[in-house]
Curated annotation (Swiss-Prot):
UniProt keywords, alphabetically: Acyltransferase, Amino-acid biosynthesis, Cytoplasm, Methionine biosynthesis, Transferase
Residues annotated as site: Important for substrate specificity: 192
The protein's name: Homoserine O-succinyltransferase
Lineage, opening ranks: Bacteria, Pseudomonadati, Pseudomonadota, Gammaproteobacteria, Enterobacterales
Pathway(s) this gene product operates in, as recorded in its UniProt entry: Amino-acid biosynthesis; L-methionine biosynthesis via de novo pathway; O-succinyl-L-homoserine from L-homoserine: step 1/1
Biological process according to GO: L-methionine biosynthetic process from homoserine via O-succinyl-L-homoserine and cystathionine
Length: 309
């Protein structure tokens, strides 16, 4: 079954052009199926691009999914039309009394910003605390992982001296875990961050299971034993040209960025890169939806019984 989205959302035509089955809300109402309710807190500046990336991965599942987009930054956006935000996004006050099967919190370009200087830090803390009682399973991506580790476990912000950018080799540490079911023993995934996630720090300060790690990128995928929390420190949702766009943007800004590792053919930015992580990204999201959301969420969300302390 497909994802359910508002009829006029730009992602509808974008994904249909890729032969992705998208069901508009008007058509979905004719089916007597209880869809999974998934809330997406989109923290990225280019919201439409990020919507397309995540909805692509969420659509590759036999489950029908009702997507609700959430924003917590009330400032005027420089990268997304106000009309789009008004038409397709809700504010936290609109949904705070609702329950959801899943929540995805995206990354944000805040790698070198102290938590106390993040304008919407109180709001993101509120959402994460709210999710304990209102969401079956939450998936944090990249910067959101760092924020959640601080809010939930008190782990301070850790940053690298140089930005981690490129496509890195990862090792599946727990191949029989539900979230890694079907993963190759080694696979590639993109990263673009200053945040540092040393596996030993996560083991020392949390009870999370580290499922996948990388010698260069550190802990990549980890989760709580009750499946309520999942963390991915990279960007499996990225399009093939996303890293290139970031690299050339930084070049134009005079930042002299390092060429992303293992990305451009022959490390030559003039050559077009190829995506080597698509199958992994799809499998990760299908596993999360199936094993962490669908199989443990109640049919009646009013009867949600959270297990997270």
């Amino acid at each position: 079954m497909p994802i359910r989205v508002p009829d006029e959302l730009p992602a509808v035509n974008f994904l249909r052009n890729e032969n992705v089955f998208v069901m508009t809300s008007s058509r979905a109402k004719t089916q007597e199926i209880r869809p999974l309710k998934v809330l997406v807190l989109n923290l990225m500046p280019k919201k439409i691009e990020t919507e397309n990336q995540f909805l692509r991965l969420l659509s590759n599942s036999p489950l029908q999914i009702d997507i609700q987009l959430l924003r917590i930054d009330s400032r005027e956006s420089k990268n997304t039309p106000t009309e789009h935000l008004n038409n397709f996004y809700c504010n936290f006050d609109d949904i705070q009394d609702e329950n959801f099967d899943g929540l995805i919190v995206t990354g944000a370009p805040l790698g070198l910003v102290d938590f106390c200087d993040v304008v919407y830090w109180p709001q993101i803390a509120r959402v994460i605390e709210w999710a304990k009682e209102h969401v079956t399973s939450t998936l944090f991506v990249c910067w959101a992982v760092q924020a959640a580790l601080n809010i939930l476990y008190g782990i301070p912000k850790m940053t690298r001296k140089e930005k981690l950018s490129g496509v890195y080799l990862h090792q599946t540490l727990q191949p029989h875990a539900l979230l890694t079911r079907g993963f190759d023993e080694t696979f590639l995934a993109p990263h673009s961050r200053y945040a540092d996630f040393p596996a030993d720090v996560i083991r020392q300060h949390t009870d999370l299971d580290i499922l996948v790690a990388s010698e260069q990128a550190g802990a990549y995928l980890f989760a709580s034993k009750d499946k309520r929390l999942a963390f991915v420190t990279g960007h499996p949702e990225y399009d093939v040209l996303t890293l290139a766009g970031e690299f050339f943007r930084d070049c134009d800004a005079g930042l002299d960025p390092t060429v992303p590792v293992n990305y451009f053919p022959e490390d030559n930015p003039e050559l077009e890169p190829k995506a080597s992580w698509r199958s992994h990204g799809h499998l990760l999201f299908v596993n999360w939806l199936n094993y962490y959301v669908y199989q443990i969420t109640p049919y009646d969300l009013r009867k949600m019984n959270p297990t997270l302390d």
